[in-house]
Amino acid sequence: MSTNGDDHQVKDSLEQLRCHFTWELSIDDDEMPDLENRVLDQIEFLDTKYSVGIHNLLAYVKHLKGQNEEALKSLKEAENLMQEEHDNQANVRSLVTWGNFAWMYYHMGRLAEAQTYLDKVENICKKLSNPFRYRMECPEIDCEEGWALLKCGGKNYERAKACFEKVLEVDPENPESSAGYAISAYRLDGFKLATKNHKPFSLLPLRQAVRLNPDNGYIKVLLALKLQDEGQEAEGEKYIEEALANMSSQTYVFRYAAKFYRRKGSVDKALELLKKALQETPTSVLLHHQIGLCYKAQMIQIKEATKGQPRGQNREKLDKMIRSAIFHFESAVEKKPTFEVAHLDLARMYIEAGNHRKAEENFQKLLCMKPVVEETMQDIHFHYGRFQEFQKKSDVNAIIHYLKAIKIEQASLTRDKSINSLKKLVLRKLRRKALDLESLSLLGFVYKLEGNMNEALEYYERALRLAADFENSVRQGP
C-alpha cells in the first residue's frame, strides 16, 4: 500500500510533464458531449497525419467523464498508432502519451504503474540530453499541445496559435505547424469578422499551409472561405472544386464547401452537401447549425420574392422553412448548450414563427452566457432590444439593451446598428412628447457617439433646462 510520501513524490513529478493533464485545457461541462462527438468524428472521417493526438484527447475527455478504463484503451490506441505513424519520432511523440498514462494511473491509485511511465519519460529525456527530468521542450510536443488546445474551443485558440507559432519561428517550412497555425488564425479571424477596422491575418498563413500540405482538402476549403471573405470568390471556388474532387476528408470538406455555396447564394447546392455530411456525422453541431442557416436563407428568399407578403403556396413554403430552421437550430443547441450564435439564430427564428414565449426563453439563456467574443454579447443585446421594441412593444426595455450593446465599446457593425436603433426610437418618442427629459438626454448621448458635438451639446442643454424648470416647479408648488 502506497504512503502519502509516495503519492506526493509522484504528483510532483507528474506536474512537470507536458501532456493533456498539465496543459490547462479550458472545457466547460456543457461542452463535453459535443467535444467528444467532434473527437470521434475526427477519428473516423478526417484524414490526417496527426491522429495520435486526437486519441490522447479522447482519453482525457473519457477521464473527465469518469470513464478511466475507456481512457486507458484510447491511450493504448494512441501508443499503437505512434509506432505506425512516427517511427523516426516515436520516442519524442510518445512522451505525451506516456505522460497521460502516468496521470491516468495516478488518478486510479496505481502509483507503481504511474512511476513506470514516469521512468519511460525520464529515460528518453536522458537519452536526448534534455536538461529536465520529465519535461521536453521540442517542436513535436508544441504541435501536440497546439492541436489539443485548438480542438477544445474558442477560449483556447490564442494559446493554440502561440504553440504553432513557436515551432514556425524555428522551422518556417514545417507542414504540421503551418497547418495548425493557419487553422488557428482562420478561427480567430472568424471571431472578428463583424469588427470594424479588423485586418484579417489568416489569408497568407492559409496559402502557406496549402503549399506545404497540397493534399489537405480541409485547409483548402478554409482558404476558399477566407478568399470569399476578401472578395476573391472566383479563386476560392477553384480550391473548393479541388477539395471536392479529392476523396480525402470528404465529410469535413462538404461542411465548409456548403458554407461557401450558401454565402454565394447557391443554397440548394449547399443543402445537398450538408445532408450528405449529416448522414455520416448525425450529431455534428456545426452541420445542424449550417443546415438551419440554409433554411433561413431560403425563408429570406421567399420573403424578398413576395415583398414580405407571402400567400398560398409561398406562405406554406415559408412556414416549412421556418419549422426546418427551428428544428436544426434546436438540434445544435441541444447538443451544445453553450453555442451562443445558434441560440441567437434560434431566438430570431422563433420570432419569425410568432412564438414570442420561446424567443424570450432563448434570449434569457443568452443573457446568462459569457461569450468568448465581446461582439457576440453586442449581437445578443441588439437583437433582444429589437425584440423588446417591435414584438414586446417595450421602449423602456429596448433602450436598456441598446445601451448595453453600445456600452461594449468594441467598434463593430452591431454597435453602429445599436446606436442607429436607439436614435430612431428616441426621435420617435420625442415626436410623441417633445419635452421628455430622458429622450433629450439620450439623443444628446447618441449625437456624442456619432461625433456631432454641437448637436450633442444642444440636446444636453435642453435636457438640463427642462430638469431645472421641473425642479423650480416642484419647489414653487401648485
UniProtKB/Swiss-Prot annotation:
Key words of the record: Antiviral defense, Cytoplasm, Host-virus interaction, Immunity, Innate immunity, Phosphoprotein, Repeat, RNA-binding, TPR repeat, Ubl conjugation
Phenotype for R187H: Abolishes PPP-RNA-binding. Loss of capped RNA-binding. Loss of translation inhibition of viral RNAs lacking 2'-O-methylation of the 5' cap
Cellular-component GO terms for this entry: cytoplasm; cytosol; host cell
Subcellular location per the Swiss-Prot or TrEMBL entry: Cytoplasm
Protein name, UniProt field: Antiviral innate immune response effector IFIT1
Binding of mRNA, residues: W147
Native species: Homo sapiens (Human)
Principal location listed in the UniProt entry: cytoplasm
Effect upon mutating Q42A: Decreased capped RNA-binding. Decreased translation inhibition of viral RNAs lacking 2'-O-methylation of the 5' cap
GO molecular function: enzyme inhibitor activity; RNA binding; RNA sequestering activity
Quaternary state and interactors: Component of an interferon-dependent multiprotein complex, at least composed of IFIT1, IFIT2 and IFIT3. Interacts (via TPR repeats 1-4) with RPL15. Interacts with STING1/MITA; could disrupt STING1 interaction with MAVS or TBK1, acting as a negative-feedback regulator of virus-triggered signaling. Interacts with EIF3E; this could be an alternative way to inhibit translation.
Effect seen on changing H289A: Decreased capped RNA-binding. Loss of capped RNA-binding and decreased translation inhibition of viral RNAs lacking 2'-O-methylation of the 5' cap
Role description: Plays a key role in the innate immune response as part of an interferon-dependent multiprotein complex, recognizing and sequestering viral RNAs that lack host-specific 2'-O-methylation at their 5' cap. By distinguishing these RNAs from host mRNAs, inhibits their translation by competing with the translation initiation factor eIF4E. Could also prevent viral replication through its interaction with DNA replication origin-binding protein E1 of several viruses. Causes the translocation of E1 from the nucleus to the cytoplasm and can also inhibit its helicase activity in vitro.
Post-translational modification: Phosphorylated.
Gene3D superfamilies: Tetratricopeptide repeat domain (1.25.40.10)
Entries under PROSITE patterns matching the protein: TPR (PS50005), TPR_REGION (PS50293)
Residues binding RNA, per UniProt: G190, K259, H289, Q290, K336
Inducing or repressing factors: By type I interferons, dsRNAs and viruses.
InterPro entries, per the entry: TPR-like_helical_dom_sf, TPR_2, TPR_rpt
GO terms under biological process: antiviral innate immune response; cellular response to exogenous dsRNA; cellular response to type I interferon; defense response to virus; intracellular transport of viral protein in host cell; negative regulation of protein binding; negative regulation of viral genome replication; negative regulation of viral translation
Consequence recorded when altering Y218A: Decreased capped RNA-binding. Decreased translation inhibition of viral RNAs lacking 2'-O-methylation of the 5' cap
Effect of Y157F: Reduced PPP-RNA-binding. Reduced capped RNA-binding. Loss of capped RNA-binding and decreased translation inhibition of viral RNAs lacking 2'-O-methylation of the 5' cap
Region forming the signal peptide: none
Protein's UniProt keywords contain RNA-binding: yes
Ranges occupied by TPR repeats: 52-85, 95-128, 141-174, 183-216, 218-249, 251-284, 305-339, 340-373, 378-412, 437-470
Effect on the protein upon substituting R38A: Loss of capped RNA-binding
